[in-house]
Amino acid sequence: MIITTTMHIENKPVQEYKGIVFGEVVEGRNFVKDFMSGIRDIVGGRSGSYEDSLMSARQAALDGMSQRASKMGANAIIGVSFQYSTVGAQNGMLMITCNGTAVVV
């Protein structure tokens, strides 16, 4: 599956548009990670645990979107974008969504 943020794939013209596809992930925050992240922020370090969680969640959203596109008969997704927001009580969860257009190239 080709996945790109652009609307065109070089040397691969779109043959058929299949429709809009989405991927969603909602991840709860972990108290220990929050505590350690706060300590790192105080001393100026980066929060590796949050970065790892974010990368994992983003990949899960992409995987879900890719699976949906594949079920539609697509072999590529163009125009992909991501949105990040916090949801839940006291914004305790991170929601990552991605969307794009499923196509055949």
Regions found by a protein language model. Give the residues of each.
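N-terminal presequence-like segments and the immediate start of the first folded domain
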Residues: 1-33, 71-75, 86, 92-105
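Charge-dense, low-complexity polyampholytic segments
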Residues: 80-88
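Short, well-ordered alpha-helical segments
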Residues: 21, 31-81
